[in-house]
């Protein structure tokens, strides 16, 4: 990964106006933030800049307002939570450009923190419109991007600003990039990837990229059924994309060419209905009843997955192994996650995980603090796993 500048490269920023792109796209119900994780992740960058005397000006999007103001998507509603997390007063401007923003910035003292209104209230944000970028840049001397989760978008506040102002990575961005470099950029081998989830169709690029980079690819979740069916296994009524059999075969051929082992379930936990406490049984993967569906990988498969994790120096994980939301179909995901956490805590494994369902599954297993790094970035994490260039990251390595 090319070098990029971080906050460590910033000298004497007292009095400087620092535009900080953060991810504050948090879930809100009845006007209250229900999960402040994303705010907590960017707090260190904000507070470090403030403590050094910078005038910290926060840029963020919230929801999809489609280029015009929508009251329910105003960032004003999250100000109290941001203040609670930072333990620091913040002011709010009713626009991210124009007089409201300029006036609010002009009133700032050194160390103050200002949140500007939702950047997506303007069409220029998602279009990366040069005129809009210039209006944003007018309020800053320095640009810091701490929103890896939005780095796959070439928007005005994530990519355009880095062309106008000296650009640096914030602490969250820095930690994410360093963790991802350990995961797939320059990993210690052997590297094992676990990919689960419902559908192959949403992860074709990811799987094709991984088989060229990892030593073993463990496939679980509903997508394993598509690979099993492509191999000639009868998967009963299991979720399966039969029309992607040829794609699955191509991925397996590419894996063989690249020297990547494909690890598929040897047994499964099957049920006739997908409900909590449904009657279920463990069957060999070649003996799935015609009227049943596989909802989790079985204990023999779990032991195999744990053995692969034990052999690995690096683990990259995206997607659960089974329908973890409903017991007892969470057993395999929990067992594998706990084993990976134990190996990580023992200093034997670098473990990097990401993706919405993955984060939820690892939280469910109670091990989210025990992995080397868990990305909350969603789409950006997936595009990184697919081997795609992320505009918001690429510009940091070439910015003036």
Swiss-Prot record:
Q: In which pathway does it act?
A: Carbohydrate degradation; glycolysis; pyruvate from D-glyceraldehyde 3-phosphate: step 2/5
Q: Could you say which residues bind substrate here?
A: 23-25, 38, 61-64, 120, 153
This protein's UniProt keywords: ATP-binding, Cytoplasm, Glycolysis, Kinase, Nucleotide-binding, Transferase
Q: What class of enzyme is it?
A: transferase
EC number(s): the record gives 2.7.2.3
This enzyme catalyses:
(2R)-3-phosphoglycerate + ATP = (2R)-3-phospho-glyceroyl phosphate + ADP
Q: Which GO terms describe its molecular function?
A: ADP binding; ATP binding; phosphoglycerate kinase activity
Task: Give the residues the record marks as binding ATP.
Answer: 203, 325, 355-358
GO CC terms on record?
cytosol
What Pfam families does its record include?
PGK (PF00162)
Major subcellular site: cytoplasm
One GO biological process this protein is involved in is: gluconeogenesis
Where does this one sit in the cell? Cytoplasm
**Subunit structure and binding partners:** Monomer.
> Family assignment?
Belongs to the phosphoglycerate kinase family.
Q: Please give the name of this protein.
A: Phosphoglycerate kinase
Q: What is the organism field in this record?
A: Agrobacterium fabrum (strain C58 / ATCC 33970) (Agrobacterium tumefaciens (strain C58))
């Amino acid at each position: 990964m090319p070098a990029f500048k971080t906050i460590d490269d910033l000298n004497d920023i007292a009095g400087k106006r620092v535009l900080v792109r953060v991810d504050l796209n948090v879930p809100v119900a009845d006007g209250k933030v229900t999960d402040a994780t994303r705010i907590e992740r960017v707090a260190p960058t904000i507070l470090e800049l403030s403590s050094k005397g910078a005038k910290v000006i926060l840029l963020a999007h919230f929801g999809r307002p489609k280029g015009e103001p929508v009251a329910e998507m105003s960032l004003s509603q999250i100000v109290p939570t941001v203040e609670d997390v930072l333990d620091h007063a913040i002011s709010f401007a009713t626009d991210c450009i124009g007089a409201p923003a300029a006036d609010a910035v002009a009133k700032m003292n050194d160390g103050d923190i200002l949140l500007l209104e939702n950047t997506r209230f303007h069409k220029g944000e998602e279009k990366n419109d040069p005129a809009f970028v210039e209006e944003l840049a007018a309020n800053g001397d320095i640009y810091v991007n701490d929103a890896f989760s939005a780095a796959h978008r070439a928007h005005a506040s994530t990519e355009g600003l880095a062309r106008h102002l000296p650009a640096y990575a914030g602490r969250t961005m820095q930690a994410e990039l360093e963790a991802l470099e350990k995961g797939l950029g320059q990993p210690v081998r052997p590297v094992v990837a676990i990919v689960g989830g419902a559908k192959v169709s949403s992860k074709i690029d990811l799987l094709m990229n991984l088989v060229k980079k990892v030593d073993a690819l463990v496939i679980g979740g509903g997508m394993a059924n598509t690979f099993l069916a492509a191999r000639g296994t009868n998967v009963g009524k299991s979720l399966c994309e039969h029309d992607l059999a040829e794609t699955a075969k191509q991925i397996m051929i590419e894996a063989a060419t690249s020297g990547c082992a494909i690890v598929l379930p040897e047994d499964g936990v099957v049920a006739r209905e997908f409900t909590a406490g449904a009657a279920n049984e463990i069957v060999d993967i070649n003996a799935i009843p015609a009227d049943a569906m596989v909802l989790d990988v079985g204990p023999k498969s779990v032991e195999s997955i744990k053995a692969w994790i034990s052999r690995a120096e690096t683990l990259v994980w995206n997607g659960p192994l089974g329908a973890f939301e409903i017991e007892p179909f969470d057993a395999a995901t929990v067992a594998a996650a706990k084993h990976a956490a134990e190996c990580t805590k023992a200093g034997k494994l670098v473990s990097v995980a990401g993706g919405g369902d993955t984060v939820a599954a690892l939280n469910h297993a109670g091990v989210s603090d025990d992995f080397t790094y868990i990305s909350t970035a969603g789409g950006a994490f997936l595009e990184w796993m697919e081997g795609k260039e992320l505009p918001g990251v690429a510009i940091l390595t070439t910015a003036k």
